[in-house]
């Protein structure tokens, strides 16, 4: 949650602030060795009686691990370039850069972020976190791209902070969730007794290979792939399924009765340079709630990535209200499949079980 809730749109291993476990599979293994060596060195200096630990020790132990896939130490979620580098005076400023934090749109949202960080520093100063690091694997770019699971993870963080004596209310972070995972629309399928809600989700964009350009080479970012969160409340899993463009969504239970969530990954537009350039755009996305007992669609909705009429917007939104109105105007509670509808068997990915990738045929 702390890596993705407050970040910008460009996330993932090739972003400006990748997580330490997003680039290499053995990174956490090496990081645990570095932590153990730091503890050994601190104990060694304390045992010597001088009680002095060289301040450059942190830089030498971690600088080669807190880097992106190309070895750039500045592109890291935790950048220690200016903490205490022995290479020069500009690197000894005592600064730790948290590069995964994007400036929020309101001062009070920034205030809550700073309060949370200060409380965490105070807590870990008092009781250091020494538990084994979790190997999330592909779950990072699967269920933690969805706002529901990011919110659950933050709830666990806040519960731990409250148990340590730092009281944080979940409502303080509601604006952050609405800003990071904006609501697209909601439809009630009265015949099925359920509600279907769509929200924007996160998507780790890829950096393409080098291409020739005037004056040198360039590497484009493939921003043509987007993701939506599909959240269903009150669903009877033995009778109803949800499909998008004719494919069954692999909905997963959240632990709450009747609540199911999944992500839908799709090609929003077709740029000239992208991964799998022969795959066209999947918009508009047509969602259907299918009654498998009666083989018919009992409700649904339709979502357009851009202007529903196929036009381009002539101007940028003047403020957040206009941007929100455009997003809501692209959502329709009509347009789903009428009449008889047979849902195909659900196909769950071994690597990403919470996500349906429409690029897969």
PLM regions: where:
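C-terminal accessory/tail domains of diverse enzymes
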Residues: 1-361
